[in-house]
């Protein structure tokens, strides 16, 4: 069985929040893997051992297949992060659209923008927003200063560009690969070089990769510092530790041809991704309110943009599973002035999904 309506490893039903904040046992992720792409003509080679050319480990995860070039995509984000503070929009657009580091064996370049404009991906973001390319639409508008970003300062647009690329697109790419792995597993395609485990490996390559300080892995560590949820080393988020463990479990399940084990691991992986971006949603909403109390409306607008960019990563988890996202959207959406609602209003929307995933107070922490 593949993942259902909204993400890897979900079961039937939806996580609709009731007044008591309970959640039914189902919801799950940012994706829709119900479209389990058939792997017609693909290999059904029995699972086994890593390939001879398997990429060396990254961050404690031993790849089973070759993702030498996939793990370099995050280096493009390093290049973007180096210049985004100087608002070099045209240079960023060039890196985004044409890529730099992830050169494939045929000489073509794997690009962040190329993924963002791709239609029919298994991340569910398009399903939720009802448009074919919502990831690219968001980033391109921020780069060009159009749509909701028209008339906004460079500092505000920076949040849409940087968080849109580093987090929205990269997490959607991770989720797409997890769901692609589940779809191949459902088809019995456990070929190590090109089947389910290869997509699973790609998910870690896009999340951590060759430069973990530039991608989602780094965001998780920052939010853990904010919320008091760093691991025993004082540097790594509990969410990153949990995600790594889930990725290892899923890899091993796929090598063993264990589809059910992979579904369970994908659900656990989604839990830890959710923690990071739920934390980010709360943090930047709180900063908006404190900015306004201090009379700093420009800072409030910047933090609203940052919070909105982060919230859009988990919004499909909520919305695709029957939870009303309008309260948080009204607080963070850039179409609205900052300052409505409260952190408590946001927490009330998130609580049912926190309960569904079994996220403990120690795992989620607290801000401030």
Outline where the language-model segments fall.
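Mature extracytoplasmic or organellar-lumen-exposed domains after removal of signal/transit peptides
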Residues: 46-368
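Ser/Thr-rich, Pro/Gly/Ala-heavy low-complexity intrinsically disordered linkers and tails
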Residues: 1-47
């Amino acid at each position: 069985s593949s993942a259902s309506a909204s993400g890897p490893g979900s079961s039937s039903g939806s996580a609709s929040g009731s007044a008591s904040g309970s959640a039914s046992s189902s919801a799950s992720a940012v994706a829709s893997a119900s479209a389990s792409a058939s792997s017609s003509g693909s290999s059904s080679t029995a699972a086994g051992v890593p390939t001879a050319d398997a990429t060396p480990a990254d961050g404690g995860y031993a790849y089973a297949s070759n993702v030498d070039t996939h793990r370099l995509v995050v280096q493009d984000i390093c290049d973007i992060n180096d210049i985004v503070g100087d608002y070099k929009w045209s240079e960023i657009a060039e890196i985004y659209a044409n890529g730099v580091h992830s050169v494939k064996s045929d000489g073509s370049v794997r690009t962040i923008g190329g993924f963002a404009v791709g239609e029919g991906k298994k991340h569910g973001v398009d399903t939720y927003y009802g448009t074919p390319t919502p990831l690219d639409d968001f980033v391109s508008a921020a780069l060009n200063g159009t749509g909701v970003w028209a008339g906004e300062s460079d500092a505000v647009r920076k949040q849409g560009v940087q968080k849109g690329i580093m987090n929205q697109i990269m997490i959607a790419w991770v989720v797409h690969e997890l769901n692609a792995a589940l779809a191949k597993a459902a088809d019995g395609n456990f070929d190590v070089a090109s089947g389910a485990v290869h997509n699973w490996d790609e998910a870690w390559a896009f999340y951590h990769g060759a430069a973990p300080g530039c991608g989602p892995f780094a965001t998780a560590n920052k939010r853990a510092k904010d919320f008091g949820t760093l691991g025993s080393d004082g540097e790594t988020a509990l969410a990153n530790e949990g995600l790594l463990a889930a990725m290892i479990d899923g890899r091993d399940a796929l090598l063993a041809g264990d589809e059910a084990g992979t579904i369970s691991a994908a659900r656990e992986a989604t839990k830890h991704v959710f923690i990071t971006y739920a934390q980010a949603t709360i943090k930047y909403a709180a900063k908006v309110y404190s900015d306004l109390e201090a009379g700093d409306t420009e800072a409030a607008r910047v933090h609203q943009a940052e919070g909105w960019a982060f919230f859009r990563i988990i919004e499909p988890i909520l919305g695709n599973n029957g939870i009303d996202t309008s309260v948080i959207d009204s607080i963070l959406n850039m179409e609205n002035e900052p300052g409505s609602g409260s952190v408590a209003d946001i927490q009330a929307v998130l609580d049912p999904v926190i309960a569904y995933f079994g996220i403990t107070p120690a795992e989620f922490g607290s801000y401030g």
